[in-house]
Each structure stands twice: as C-alpha cells, then as structure tokens.
A protein has these predicted regions:
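Positively charged, low-complexity intrinsically disordered leader regions
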Residues: 1-56
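Phosphate/diphosphate ligand-binding glycine-rich loop within oxidoreductases
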Residues: 34-95
Length: 95
C-alpha cells in the first residue's frame, strides 16, 4: 500500500499487524532510522495538532518534512487537481 487515506483502506489483519509493529517500535524506537528521508504532508484544512504530531514524529525519527497547509499560494488556485498535486509531492518525497 502506497497511500493510506482512510481506515477503510486497511483489512482487520493489516490493522492488527500495524498495531503490533507500533507496539514493538514504541518499546525500541532506535529500530527506525529515517535520516535522509523526506515526508510530504498536504493539509487542505486547518489541523494543527495532527500536522504537528506528524511533523514532530518524522523529525524525531531523523527525517524531514515538506508540505502545504491550505491552498493559498499553490497551483490548486490555478485549477490543479488534488490528484495532480499529490503526484508532484510524491516525486519530491520518500514518504
């Protein structure tokens, strides 16, 4: 799976798998090294806590974050679709 948009995108087995992995990584975060990795984050609506938690987690794991909040100053204002914007962001990021 490349993108997780909704919990409905996950089967019950996959959800359980992810929860077990999260539990293991929570006990020993040194297993994760995201240095030299870039995460793209696109927030079309204000979501301060969610955005900050994603950015904080990525930075704590050694990675960087690029992104956008809202559509002001983006090509969306010129008519670019969400899908096109997501494709471009994916080219500039690893996650």
């Amino acid at each position: 799976m490349k993108h997780l948009i909704s919990m409905r995108d996950l089967s019950a087995d996959k959800t359980l798998q992810l929860l077990k992995l999260a539990e293991r990584l929570e006990k020993d975060p040194s297993q994760i090294d995201l240095s030299r990795r870039v995460m793209a984050a696109m927030f079309y609506e204000a979501s301060t806590r969610t955005r900050m938690s994603f950015e904080s987690a990525m930075k704590r794991l050694g990675g960087e974050v690029i992104g956008m909040v809202g559509t002001s100053g983006t090509s969306v204002e010129k008519g670019e679709t969400l899908a096109d914007t997501a494709k471009i962001m994916a080219r500039y990021s690893d996650i």
